Amino acid sequence: MSFLKTSDPAVYNAIMQETTRLKETIDLIASENYTSKAVLEAQGSVFTNKYAEGYPGKRYYAGCEYADAVEELAIDRAKTLFHAEHANVQPHSGAQANMAAYFAMVKPGDTIMGLTLSHGGHLTHGSKVNFTGKLYHVIEYGLNAETERIDYDNLEKLAMEHRPRMIVTGASAYPRILDFERFRAICDKVDAKLMVDIAHIAGLVAAGLHPSPVPYADVVTSTSHKTLRGPRGGFILCKEQYAKAIDQAVFPVMQGGPLMQVVAAKAVAFQEAMQPGFVTYQKKTLENTQVMAEELRKLGLRLVSGGTDNHLVLVDLSPIGVNGYDAQLALRRAGIVINRNTVPFAENQTANVPAGIRLGCPAATSRGFGPAEIRQTVGWIGKILKNIGNEDVEKQVLAEVIHLCRKFPVPGIDI
């Protein structure tokens, strides 16, 4: 970065500070990960300069022959990786992929169903503050109060009563396997379309470690980062019969020109996900998450639904008298990066000061952490939670965290 250092020291310094932060902290945010050096190089390539409105072979600008080539690579690899009939790799984000899917599959004012945000859903699945809550008539479904898993029986009851045009599944904080076959059966009973957002679990699905929604869903949306370890962006998979509607919803309805440097990076990430090592990585992520859940239980902490089937755990801190906001700040000061999160059915919580925290192992596993390091990290978490606001404890843990982190290079950076 010699040119940037000279031309814009302020931005250069911010990047260097962020690099140091990445190296000296343990990232347990379930939606974050580290990309490879190859992905970073593709995203910083000369494709940044190219405008490519339209689709391969049908561009509105000249000079797109190589943009066509790289987008076709990304499309073909996404279709192969997820066994899909059609793929659109242009969405700038998961939220924009979702918006395009809505515009293609339903009309404003139609009834849709989505998992309520406080039960693990996502803003774009029907939240009142999101475009979905403003443009559509939303019926929320939730979890069973005893099992803290999706209440499929009540979901079916609500679907029969309200006859939605589309049911949305997928989550941002749900630690259990999603039953796509049951969702499909419910949709068929009410003649509804099924949209599945696999942003969090795309890597697990690609590796065959979580059931795939592709055989059941009319449309599947996702991000290309998180467990997939690609650049920040989105993509859409669908059945061929919806391909034209999906493509038109992305361009020209939702977006203009795609970010071709990001499309190139997506192509690289999809190729990386086809390698045997990617499956090994996902298996290690699941193993680490099981170890994390067990160690958290040993600390006496309550896990929502009692455990996890995927890459994340949701911890209810209310029994120990700590809120998620204070926990997030204290852990950050100690070099452990997590996010506060609402807990299903918890009382006296807000989005800003929720009752719990969400932890995940994708980034730590990418860095090379195994069960031993996860156990050590959970031990530090327990120490911080028992000593909220104790600066001496935070400084002690921070020093130990930095010492551990120096043994594990950050992918894409420490090479």
Swiss-Prot record:
* InterPro entries assigned to the protein according to its UniProt record, in alphabetical order: PyrdxlP-dep_Trfase, PyrdxlP-dep_Trfase_major, PyrdxlP-dep_Trfase_small, Ser_HO-MeTrfase, Ser_HO-MeTrfase-like, Ser_HO-MeTrfase_PLP_BS, SHMT-like_dom
UniProt GO MF annotations: glycine hydroxymethyltransferase activity; pyridoxal phosphate binding
Q: Which cofactor does it need?
A: pyridoxal 5'-phosphate
Which sites bind (6S)-5,6,7,8-tetrahydrofolate? Answer: L117, G121, H122, L123
* Site residues, Plays an important role in substrate specificity: H225
Chief localization class?
A: cytoplasm
Q: Which GO terms describe its cellular component?
A: cytosol
Q: Where in the cell is it found?
A: Cytoplasm
User: What does the entry give for GO biological process?
Assistant: glycine biosynthetic process from serine; tetrahydrofolate interconversion
UniProt family annotation: Belongs to the SHMT family.
- PANTHER family recorded: SERINE HYDROXYMETHYLTRANSFERASE (PTHR11680), SERINE HYDROXYMETHYLTRANSFERASE 1 (PTHR11680:SF35)
Task: Provide the assembly information.
Answer: Homodimer.
What the protein does?
Catalyzes the reversible interconversion of serine and glycine with tetrahydrofolate (THF) serving as the one-carbon carrier. This reaction serves as the major source of one-carbon groups required for the biosynthesis of purines, thymidylate, methionine, and other important biomolecules. Also exhibits THF-independent aldolase activity toward beta-hydroxyamino acids, producing glycine and aldehydes, via a retro-aldol mechanism.
* Protein name as annotated: Serine hydroxymethyltransferase
Organism, scientific name: Dehalococcoides mccartyi (strain ATCC BAA-2100 / JCM 16839 / KCTC 5957 / BAV1)
What phylogenetic lineage does the species belong to?
Bacteria, Bacillati, Chloroflexota, Dehalococcoidia, Dehalococcoidales
